[in-house]
């Protein structure tokens, strides 16, 4: 009887000890808003891919290497380019920028957060600058869209003037947040001022 009581007591004690373990942990191999956007290096990593919005230097250099017609214009003249085959209507980077702006407030370091928020505002302005340059009127999105939000997904184009006013507001925010120290590889206050001009 004593052995049974001892065994039962140890079993119950073991159950209590192991049931108090917190096994509801976030996976360390995946990103989520709850586990990311917590510090400067994470904000920097997220905003680094915004730089792919800039034209590739290789393409610019190749265009000037000969006296032939530029490949983009050449494709248009040969009839190979159409709205369906052109990659200029992609909105992926805008989603990434808006996603960042919705979640960056989780970083407790306000100074670092403002710097990278400035990068995001600059690139949202640059994104729309390029869209207006290519297409004229476009829809303005300043939030992440859900795939089931038909009303926002089918939003009509807005007047160019409204879009450019929003671009200027984003540039003003970026100018106030970006560092003033010159940098050859990162956007700064001076980059934003150049785009605004």
PLM segments and residue spans:
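Conserved, well-structured interaction surfaces
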Residues: 37, 41-46, 54-56, 70-135, ...
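Proline-centered turn/helix-capping motifs that create local helix->coil transitions or kinks
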Residues: 21-22, 58-63, 131-140
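Bacterial Sec-dependent N-terminal signal peptides
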Residues: 1-28
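Aromatic-lined, polymer-binding surfaces characteristic
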Residues: 185-194
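Short, conserved phosphate-binding/catalytic loop or strand-edge motifs used
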Residues: 141-148, 195
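Membrane-proximal, proline-rich intrinsically disordered regions
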Residues: 21-61
């Amino acid at each position: 009887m004593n052995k049974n009581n001892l065994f039962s007591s140890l079993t119950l004690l073991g159950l209590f000890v192991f049931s108090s373990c917190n096994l509801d942990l976030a996976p360390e191999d995946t990103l989520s808003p709850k586990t990311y956007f917590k510090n400067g290096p994470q904000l920097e990593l997220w905003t680094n891919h915004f730089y792919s919005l800039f034209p590739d230097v290789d393409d610019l250099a190749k265009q000037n290497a000969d006296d032939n017609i530029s490949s983009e214009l050449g494709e248009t003249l040969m009839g190979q380019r159409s709205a369906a085959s052109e990659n200029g209507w992609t909105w992926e980077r805008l989603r990434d920028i808006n996603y960042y702006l919705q979640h960056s407030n989780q970083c407790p370091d306000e100074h670092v957060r403002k710097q990278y928020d400035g990068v995001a505002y600059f690139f949202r302005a640059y994104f729309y600058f390029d869209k207006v340059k290519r297409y004229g009127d476009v829809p303005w999105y300043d939030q992440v869209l859900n795939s089931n939000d038909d009303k926002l997904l089918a939003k009509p184009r807005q007047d160019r003037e409204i879009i450019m006013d929003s671009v200027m507001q984003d540039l003003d925010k970026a100018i106030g947040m970006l560092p003033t120290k010159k940098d050859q590889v990162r956007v700064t206050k001076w980059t934003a001022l150049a785009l605004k001009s």
